[in-house]
A protein has these predicted regions:
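Extracellular and secretory-pathway beta-repeat/beta-biased strand scaffolds
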Residues: 1-665
Length: 665
């Protein structure tokens, strides 16, 4: 321990082919004063730890001088191979200041053979206006953490600030956990990076920082987590951090730029009964979550990227950028960080059973984007709620076993976008990702929901082959306009699906407005066919004063609705239109196609347009209805029109002007 901030505390180094720590052993290089904590370096070929009757194994380099003093930086903890004995491994990376260059920055690692940690806690935590430290683990074999925990913490420290001794903080004051191995295995374990900036603490002018830190989990072959938690959390005005589960970085410093410079994917990532979270709980900037693998399996697990309120403080250049509404119309960057974060998963095969992927906001910051880039995406319901066994998350109250993919807003921030497309190598900025080959969702809820005055979140799915929806609900819900909106023209939650063919069996696709904001539009586009069956429903509706959205279906050669419904409806406002186009045939069997408005004389029902070569109606209804308002029109343009006696086509208004039925055949 050192009280004098000019005194450098002692470091600890162990060098041996085999190191075993057991039964309450502690390796500590802590400080309780203003000096930096010491560094701990274990140069080993094999490291094994095991808790015992006398307690858990502890490796710590903490700075803890309490809330009333100014502390030093938490130290570096390095577990690696033996320099001079272990052959060095040099890797080339791009430097972040020259992203388009060839690999030009060399970093040399010394890899141990194996880490087997059981009942062990490793932490480099700073409490009391101090920057956190770094924990690094390097092995070319397996890094196993069983019933173990790794943590780093930063408290009340400004990014790029100086330490109490006047020296710059290492790593700009960011804390980091960096684990490299051929295989990384977590079981009953935790990986945590935390940061806190208090409103009443010793850092009243910290500009939205520091970050909760960086968690880099880099595995050459596989990453496996079982009943484990990976959490990157910003408290107060601290930013959420960056978490990556990847094979290795594209850049030397782990930058988060994605489309032009994707990181290398792990062969296999599997999360079972686990949770990966990046969250700004209060007023910090959002974080980034990146998981890349050739195969990603989520088995009753939850991936979460949460935000709350904007900071409303100046950035390092004195600009007020992070304010309410920032990030809604496009990317806004402050101090190198976007004011809207993102959750990105990329895989050739993404398989989700139970649990889900969520990006909620409970405050006035817009929710983070969810980007799922997969050649093949498959979901199926589980048997229980997802998350860790000790703290499962119930994402669907009615049925916790369902998969949930959701970006929702419980206050004024607005929902983020959900995009499901294909995986890609480097592509220029602002160029769309290619489509997936197959999207197959079963027992799944895909949802953007804005319960107050925030903007609606868009949902898009694009596939070259099929989009199959089995007992799956896709919904985009909005509520009220904001007072500053002009002529009611603000983003609502639109739903866009495009594929080779689209199949719906049960479930539904819905765009709903509950208030003054207009509802979103629903668009389905297929190169070959659209089939809706088994009680499936496609709807655009309004229960408030905002108009219902439109439904547009371009089905390629064929459209079939069997035991299904396609409707727009408005209780108080005007309804939306329905347009279905097909090259060859549109066929309804025991189906319902309707637009209806239940409001006053100033409302009007939506129009219905069918435009194929052949229209066939079997025990089906095509209705454009109104109560006091004007009924919508029905237009059928077809070379052949066939309707059995039990089918009904009607455009009517009970007390207003009825619409017209126009069949051109």
């Amino acid at each position: 321990n050192a009280v004098d901030p000019t005194v450098v505390p002692g470091n600890i180094a162990m060098t041996a082919q085999r190191v075993e720590l057991a039964n309450g052993t502690a390796v500590r290089a802590d400080t309780t004063g203003g000096a930096d904590a010491g560094a701990i370096t274990l140069n080993v070929d094999t490291l094994k730890t095991q808790s015992g009757p006398d307690g858990r194994v502890l490796i710590s380099s903490d700075s803890n001088c309490g809330s009333q003093c100014v502390g030093g930086q938490a130290g570096y903890i390095t577990l690696q191979g033996i320099p001079g004995f272990t052959p060095p491994s040099t890797r080339l990376y791009r430097h972040v200041t020259a992203p388009d260059s060839e690999p030009n920055r060399a970093i040399t690692y010394y890899f141990a053979r194996e880490f087997d940690l059981r009942g062990t806690d490793i932490h480099s935590d700073a409490i009391g206006n101090a920057p956190g430290g770094i924990v690094m683990m390097r092995t070319n074999g397996q890094a196993s953490l069983i019933d173990s925990g790794v943590s780093v913490t930063t408290q009340d420290f400004t990014i790029n600030d100086n330490k109490p001794n006047g020296q710059p903080a290492q790593n700009q004051g960011f804390s980091r956990i960096d684990i490299m191995g051929r295989d990384i295995v977590l079981k009953d374990s935790t990986i945590k990076a935390n940061a806190e900036v208090s409103d009443i603490g010793s850092c009243p002018l910290c500009q939205g920082g520091p970050s909760a830190g960086e968690i880099w989990l880099r595995a050459e072959h596989s990453f496996t987590a079982d009943n484990s938690l990976i959490a990157n959390t910003g408290h107060g005005r601290a930013q959420a951090g960056i978490t990556k589960i990847i094979k290795d970085h594209y850049f030397s410093f782990g930058a988060v730029w994605d489309a032009p410079y994707p990181d290398a994917p792990i062969d296999t990532v599997k999360l079972t009964n686990s949770e990966v979270t990046v969250e700004a709980l209060h007023e910090g900037l959002p974080g980034y979550l990146r998981i890349r693998g050739d195969t990603i399996i989520l088995d009753h697990s939850v991936v979460n990227s949460q935000v709350n309120n904007v900071t409303n403080v100046l950035d390092s250049q004195g600009r007020l950028i992070d304010v309410v509404g920032a990030g809604e119309a496009g990317t806004v960057v402050t101090d190198g960080r976007s004011v809207q974060g993102s959750l990105l998963m990329s895989a050739k095969n993404l398989d989700i059973t139970g649990g889900g992927i969520i990006a909620p906001t409970q405050g006035n910051r817009i929710a983070n984007r969810i980007e799922l880039h997969a050649d093949v995406l498959t979901t199926s319901p589980g048997t229980r709620a997802g998350g860790t066994l000790a703290a499962p998350r119930i994402l669907d109250v009615a049925d916790p076993s369902r998969v949930v993919i959701s970006s929702s807003s419980g206050s004024t921030g607005g929902a983020g976008m959900i995009s499901i497309t294909g995986v890609s190598g480097p592509i220029p900025d602002d160029v769309p990702y290619p489509p997936s080959s197959t999207i197959r969702l079963t027992g799944t809820d895909v949802l953007t929901d804005t319960s107050s005055i925030g903007l609606g979140g868009r949902i898009e799915m694009r596939a070259r082959g099929p989009i199959e929806l089995h007992n799956t609900n896709i919904s985009a819900n909005v509520t009220d306009l904001r007072p500053q909106s002009v002529n009611g023209q603000e983003q609502s939650g639109n739903i866009d699906l495009s594929a080779g063919n689209i199949l719906m069996e049960g479930g539904g696709i819905s765009a709903l407005t509950r208030g003054t904001r207009s509802g979103g539009n629903v668009s389905l586009s297929a190169a070959q066919s659209v089939t809706v069956s088994d009680g499936a429903a496609i709807s655009a509706s309004s229960t408030g004063l905002g108009n219902a959205g439109n439904i547009t279906i371009n089905s390629g050669p064929r459209f079939l609705a069997q035991n299904a419904s396609i409707t727009t409806e408005a209780n108080q406002a005007s309804g939306g239109d329905i347009i279905i186009q097909a090259i060859d045939s549109i066929r309804f069997i025991n189906g319902r196609l309707s637009t209806s408005v239940l409001g006053g004389p100033d409302t009007s029902g939506g129009n219905i347009t069918l435009d194929p070569a052949v229209v066939t109606l079997q025990n089906s209804h095509v209705l454009a209805q109104a109560v006091q308002g004007q009924g919508g029109n029905i237009t059928i343009i077809a070379g052949t029109f066939l309707a059995d006696p039990t089918s009904v086509i009607s455009a009517s208004s009970q007390f207003g002007l009825s619409g017209a039925v126009n069949i051109q055949s």
